[in-house]
Structures are given as C-alpha cells and as structure tokens.
Amino acid sequence: MQQRRPVRRALLSVSDKAGIVEFAQALSARGVELLSTGGTARLLAEKGLPVTEVSDYTGFPEMMDGRVKTLHPKVHGGILGRRGQDDAIMEEHQIQPIDMVVVNLYPFAQTVAREGCSLEDAVENIDIGGPTMVRSAAKNHKDVAIVVKSSDYDAIIKEMDDNEGSLTLATRFDLAIKAFEHTAAYDSMIANYFGSMVPAYHGESKEAAGRFPRTLNLNFIKKQDMRYGENSHQQAAFYIEENVKEASVATATQVQGKALSYNNIADTDAALECVKEFAEPACVIVKHANPCGVAIGNSILDAYDRAYKTDPTSAFGGIIAFNRELDAETAQAIISRQFVEVIIAPSASEEALKITAAKQNVRVLTCGQWGERVPGLDFKRVNGGLLVQDRDLGMVGAEELRVVTKRQPTEQELRDALFCWKVAKFVKSNAIVYAKNNMTIGIGAGQMSRVYSAKIAGIKAADEGLEVKGSSMASDAFFPFRDGIDAAAAAGVTCVIQPGGSIRDDEVIAAADEHGIAMLFTDMRHFRH
C-alpha cells in the first residue's frame, strides 16, 4: 500500500538557499501553505510569496540573536503529531499539522575550514533548531516529509503532481533516511572538531590542538555495490566522501566498459595517485596496486610507449593512468598492443572514445583536472581497530637533497633520481626502483628484504633488455646493510637516492664510494604497506 499523505502545509528554513525560491513557488502554486523563519522567510516574501513567519504562528518571537526560533510546541507538535491519534490534543492547543519540513543546516564545515576560525565562530554555527526539526520530521515520516537536499526538490514536485498533491510512504521513508544521514554527518563534524580542540582547553600549544580527535566519526556515501570483493567469496561495496575536494577515482566518471570491480578501483587509485606526482606528460601502468611501468615523455603516447617497455608481461591486464587528455593516437596504441582493464585520464577526446568503443569491456574513466594535492587522512583497518594518519604528500626537490658520497651525480642522474624517488613512493615496501632517461627500467616491490628488491629490479631490467648502466636507483627506506648497494652496482646503477638514517650509513656510503656511485639522502621515508 502506498499510504499517500497530502502536503498542505510546509515549513521552510534553509541555510543554503539554492533552489528554495523555485521550490517554494512550486509548493505555493499547488496550494501548500508556507511557514518559514528568519532569512528564508524574508527571501520568500521579497519574491512575492505568501509566507507566514513561524514567530507569528507560534505567537513567540525569535530571540537571542536567532538562537531560539523553532523550539516551540506548536512547531514540533505540528511535526510530531500522529495523524488520527493526536488530533484532539493538537486541536486543543491550536497546533496545526505540518506535512513537510524543508531544512538544511548552518554551514559548520565551511565555517571551521576558514582560516582564522575561532572556537566562538564555530559554536555560533552549530545548528540546534534545524537538526531538531529534521529528526522530528524523520521520526514521524509516516505522516511528514523531510527534505534536506535541494537535489530532491524537482522529484518531490513531480511526485506530488503524479499523486494529486501527495507523497508516498516509500518516498517519505527514503527522505527520512537521507535526513538521519544528514544529521549524523553534521554531528560527526562537530564532534570531530570539538575532539581536536581538547588539548587547547588543557592549556597546550596550538600544535597540540591539531591532534586527532579522541573519537573519530566518519561518514561515507555508497556509490555502488560490487559483484564481489577482493575475492569472489567476499561481498563488497564502494563508499565515497560526500564532498571530495580533489580529482580522484571517487570523483571519476565511467564513460564506457564493464562495471568496475573492487580490485579495479583499488588499482586505479594507485595508478592515478602516482601519475599526479608528475608535471610533464606521464603514464603509469599498475598491476596489483604496484606500478610496473612509469615514464614521462614529450606526449602521453611517448610516455605510454616508454612505460610499457619496463615490463610488458606485467602490463597485460593492467591499469593505465595519464595526466593529460587521452587522445586517439594513444588510445589506438593501447588497444592494438595489449589487454587493459582500465584507462583513466583527466578527459578523453571523442576520437579516442570511438577507438576504445571497439573494445567494450575496456573501462574508460575521466576524473577531471587536479590542482594542488589536498591534505587528508589515510586509514588502515586492523582487526578491532583503525589506524589513521595524514596522507603521504611529502616530496623533496633537488635543493633539499644531500650528496653524501665523494662523487656528485650528473644532471641526468639527478633528474632520474628525482623521477624514481617519486615512483618509489607508490611501490609496496620494500621498494626499489631503477630509472634511466625518465622511465622506469626495473621495479622490485614488496620483498621482505631490501636486497632482494634490488636484485629483482635488476633481473626485470635484464629480462626486458633494458640497459641499467648509468641508471639511478631509489629506495623507499634506508639500506640497513651495504648488500643493496653491491647488488645495484653489479647491475650497473651509478646513482642512488634514499632516505638515509641507518646506523650503518657509513658502511653504505663507503660501499657507494667503492663502486663510484653518487648517493643522495632525502631525509624522508616513503614506506607503503
């Protein structure tokens, strides 16, 4: 049974006024009586709409600079009153039923994100009456529709037109879910902010006040259900943040291909985040969350050709990411050369999409352009807990490197060192990357000992016939022994970039000097587990 409820009276009180005038006009045109508060009421009146101020309805004025507006029995009784059960009480106290509540809340997140926001500013942007009305209406969804998203306005009017001015129970229930999600996210933001302010109240420094909150509340929205998880016996879904501030796999639009799998999304994220590190036209090919080929070039076609050469075997069935628009020539090269699961780029030309359309199973994603990297949090689930840390946005420039060996690197060695240092950040530890002329020539990933990662990188380069002599090597963490340097020298490496910091740094540097290798210290580690 649809259990339709007619909408005869609506209360509108919004902070974000986008679309509210048009929505109110549509409601009024359909005979809905409008109640409103403060700035919303003034806006509607200015537009010539018949609107009753809540203070006129309740007989009680707004007070305390707007802190008390809607906290009144005639408001909440009208929202919470059960039709057919509380009618006599409502009539006795002259409480009019309110059939729809349209509310969005004070902009707390935007307020605290502003530079120089004080605790007092934040406190004044904590909405009290709004969430109370939202929760009241959502609780009584059997009789009342609660609208918290402007994106729902058009659909609501259409349903009212299709149902003689009424909304179905299914719609009211769906709106109630959105309402509770809305207030949960809002309260979570406030709790996180206040939790991070605790040290300041204890007289600690401003730096201490920026620590993680003592309770972490997270809100993500389901974007899609997956066929299965990492393995076919695991169920899975993909959730995203509500307001993602940076182009990412979460914001990407799929323009063709089969539905993305759990592993597709994880691997695409790894590829895209790596390619973002480069200003020049770049290509990153990823397999099982590890780069297997990375290059920069004069064009993305040049970059792709060179990245593919690193490890054609592993590139089969991989994920390919670019930091420039996918063009027809590059699309044709990929489709003609290899099987690929996903291609992601900021955009794709019409000609490129015509070419990829010949391979309908290939997933093509466009994510838009990105600017500076946005600070945020990384999470790692452990059984019974959650590890939280800042995103690893650390990187070094040439001026920050320390040459610790007798020999200085050549200009090309230095360029290659900085290039493979960027790549190593995205390779699972222990990570070793060989690079020459702005392309990877060997990658050793995920080994339990660093020396074996170095050996594997050399083996991969040899297997593909790539010349290691004169190349640079990056290590995501320090070398605990000289054996990694000996392995690199045996392969032909002439420059090493690494964090330094081992108790055996002197032995490692001495080994580099013995082999005539230039060594650079970054004083920054890039573990990736």
Curated annotation (Swiss-Prot):
GO terms for molecular function: IMP cyclohydrolase activity; phosphoribosylaminoimidazolecarboxamide formyltransferase activity. It catalyses: (6R)-10-formyltetrahydrofolate + 5-amino-1-(5-phospho-beta-D-ribosyl)imidazole-4-carboxamide = 5-formamido-1-(5-phospho-D-ribosyl)imidazole-4-carboxamide + (6S)-5,6,7,8-tetrahydrofolate; IMP + H2O = 5-formamido-1-(5-phospho-D-ribosyl)imidazole-4-carboxamide. SUPFAM superfamilies: Cytidine deaminase-like, Methylglyoxal synthase-like. Pathway: Purine metabolism; IMP biosynthesis via de novo pathway; 5-formamido-1-(5-phospho-D-ribosyl)imidazole-4-carboxamide from 5-amino-1-(5-phospho-D-ribosyl)imidazole-4-carboxamide (10-formyl THF route): step 1/1; Purine metabolism; IMP biosynthesis via de novo pathway; IMP from 5-formamido-1-(5-phospho-D-ribosyl)imidazole-4-carboxamide: step 1/1. Keywords: Acetylation, Hydrolase, Multifunctional enzyme, Purine biosynthesis, Transferase. Residues 1-148 form the MGS-like domain. The modification N6-acetyllysine is found at residue 287. It holds the Pfam family MGS. The IMP cyclohydrolase activity resides in the N-terminal region. Belongs to the PurH family. HAMAP family: PurH. This is Bifunctional purine biosynthesis protein PurH. It comes from Escherichia coli O157:H7.
